Amino acid sequence: MNEYPKKRKRKTLHPSRYSDSSGISRIADGFNGIFSDHCYSVCSMRQPDLKYFDNKDDDSDTETSNELPKFTDGIKARNRNQNYLVPSPVLRILDHTAFPTEKSADIEICDEDCDSPESVHQQTQEESPIEVHTAEDVPIAAEVHAISEDYDIETENNSSESLQDQTDEEPPAKLCKIVDKSQALNVTAQQKWPLLRANSSGLYKCELCEFNSKYFSDLKQHMILKHKRTDSNVCRVCKESFSTNMLLIEHAKLHEEDPYICKYCDYKTVIFENLSQHIADTHFSDHLYWCEQCDVQFSSSSELYLHFQEHSCDEQYLCQFCEHETNDPEDLHSHVVNEHACKLIELSDKYNNGEHGQYSLLSKITFDKCKNFFVCQVCGFRSRLHTNVNRHVAIEHTKIFPHVCDDCGKGFSSMLEYCKHLNSHLSEGIYLCQYCEYSTGQIEDLKIHLDFKHSADLPHKCSDCLMRFGNERELISHLPVHETT
């Protein structure tokens, strides 16, 4: 049985292709001048034998062969001795209306070993229908657009470096033109993706995270869904932007929690570090340690202590009661307690051994070694200068016992207690004036003295005792003393 049976002519819309008037002679061989490669079939399964072309490469260019290759399974065949297209069972001859007549922008130059169909381009002044010729006919005049159905798509994804290397080399004598793949695959312009190089492992890797994929489309979708920031995903409180709305919702929950509130003002924040920075910037002077010698402020006691070391050791602390001076504040405190304790006393309103109003000589100032402060024992007032504490005690805590007996040195907080104390000395026949140095052995002499010597300065006289006052208000405040007694 003949391996290549005769085929009946197929009538088309272009009968001139197969008419004798075309002026092209046909070969009367086993094919009867008609290609038997099922060129009009939708699915052609026969492919040429690759060994046939390998043998042809070794032959001389002057040798010719009219023998057609044997077809096995799947690629195109070409005759290297003639510059025209050799029909192949894989090639589909397309009508000139299948593609635009304009040249594709994606035409590339490849070497002889590429798998794309080869054709010799010749400029024609007029577009004419595609004519099919035999292997021994004259070179083809019309450009034939062809594409392989099982063309490997991966071969076209060459890197930019490889394409540059090929263009730098001297172009081969035979050029092959590749049809735009987007036209063959019906890919629209919106679906085209930019060419990216995969890494050494053949994966497309996300530059913002650890995501990687074998396909660039997956990477593109990942970038849009995960890393595309929009103005709608911005926090209204802190103005921070997020890639997804889900992350924004999670972040917004932080602002709903109980914020850190500044105790000095109405400032609020959900971050503790921000609150600390706010206090340091805004309320820095509200909680400072300061040096009373040079009026320099510090934010911590340790910084203040270091500042004290900077003061010259020749700086002296002076006693306010005498001419004693020292460069050690603790030594000054000890001096005041030991030498001037009588000037730093307090009145005890409690009965002490049955005697009311007796003074107890207690120190009102102590020295805190840890914090380097002089502290008032009565109210807790503190200062780094001993003179400040002494002044405080003299003003705030000594005005309540101004009456001191000249005979025994006892002091009293009120004139009534002082007068009662003076009566204790009457048994001895001595009467003392509480306003001056006058003394007498008769009570009547004392009353006359008060009326003449102190009536001008103290016009308001108490009817129950010998007390006199400079104004009526002091007298009124004195009268309740007699009501309690």
UniProtKB/Swiss-Prot annotation:
Function (record text): Binds DNA and may function as a transcriptional repressor.
Similarity comment text for this entry: Belongs to the krueppel C2H2-type zinc-finger protein family.
GO MF term set: DNA-binding transcription activator activity, RNA polymerase II-specific; DNA-binding transcription factor activity; RNA polymerase II cis-regulatory region sequence-specific DNA binding; transcription cis-regulatory region binding; zinc ion binding
GO term, biological process aspect, one: symbiont entry into host cell
Biased composition (Basic residues): 1-14
Record region (Disordered): 1-20
Name of the protein in its database record: Zinc finger protein 639
Residues that span the membrane, as ranges: none
Pfam families: zf-C2H2
UniProt keyword terms in alphabetical order: DNA-binding, Isopeptide bond, Metal-binding, Nucleus, Phosphoprotein, Repeat, Repressor, Transcription, Transcription regulation, Ubl conjugation, Zinc, Zinc-finger
Zn-finger (C2H2-type) residues: 204-227, 233-255, 260-283, 289-311, 374-397, 403-425, 431-454, 460-482
Assembly information from the UniProt record: Interacts with CTNNA2.
GN (gene name): ZNF639
Modified residues (Phosphoserine): 60, 88
Major subcellular location class: nucleus
Lineage: superkingdom: Eukaryota
InterPro entries, per database record: Znf_C2H2_sf (IPR036236), Znf_C2H2_type (IPR013087)
UniProt-annotated location(s): Nucleus
Cross-link (Glycyl lysine isopeptide (Lys-Gly) (interchain with G-Cter in SUMO2)): 76, 177, 181, 226
Region (Interaction with CTNNA2): 371-455
Cellular component per GO, a single term: nucleoplasm
